[in-house]
């Protein structure tokens, strides 16, 4: 599945670059559910924590946040290491130029997600 996502994102970003629109677009990809560590008979069950991917020429390359520890679980789930609202606050304020507090109902520390 990740190979298909990668190919689709590359094609999309290549098309944006060809149209000279890539600098205006941010791709944010996430799932509403994570995966549990323990396998069952058909794979793994839905969990509570999962990754968020950002793509586009304005995004700083690299990983942000701390990887969850596979042996330090909370009721069988990975522990969240970065609150998704920190990602949203960063996108709202640093990419869209909007205040994040009204949308997120609180203040969340932004993450260094974007190039200068």
How would you describe each model-predicted region?
Residues 1-116:
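Feature marks hydrolase-like catalytic cores characterized by long aromatic- and Gly/Pro-rich stretches
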């Amino acid at each position: 599945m990740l190979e298909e996502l990668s190919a689709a994102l590359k094609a999309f970003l290549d098309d944006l670059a060809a149209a000279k629109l890539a600098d205006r677009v941010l791709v944010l990809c996430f799932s509403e559910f994570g995966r549990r560590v323990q396998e069952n008979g058909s794979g793994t069950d839905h969990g509570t924590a999962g990754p968020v991917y950002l793509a586009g020429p304005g995004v700083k390359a690299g990983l942000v946040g701390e990887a969850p520890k596979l042996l330090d679980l909370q009721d069988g789930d990975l522990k969240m290491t970065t609150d998704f609202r920190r990602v949203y606050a960063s996108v709202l304020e640093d990419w869209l130029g909007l205040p994040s507090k009204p949308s997120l109902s609180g203040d969340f520390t932004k993450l260094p997600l974007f190039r200068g």
